[in-house]
Amino acid sequence: MPPPLARFWADVLGRQVAEDSTSEHVVLLPGDGDASGPRITFNKVPEPKTVKNRLHLDVVSDTFDAETERLLRLGAQRLRDVQGDKFRWTTFADIEGNEFDLIAG
């Protein structure tokens, strides 16, 4: 994962990029930097995206409108909004076009 994409996801998820991360393998540590806590890893693959993501992340927020604005400031692109009687979400693309949803919590 290129460093800009690593920084994007670290900011979205409130995490830190591990110092030993590379452009091929990125580790996101908990926000407090505790290496013993749960980590998220991203591995770069050589193939370009040609179809729907193989993994789709849903980010849930109690402050949906504020989080939407924050994601847009980070560089996310709004793709579509979905509103129902009891649910609301927006599908975004990250800075490389990978899709994810923000769900009102």
Tell what function each PLM region has.
Residues 1, 3, 7, 11-13, 17-68, 88-93, ...:
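Vicinal oxygen chelate
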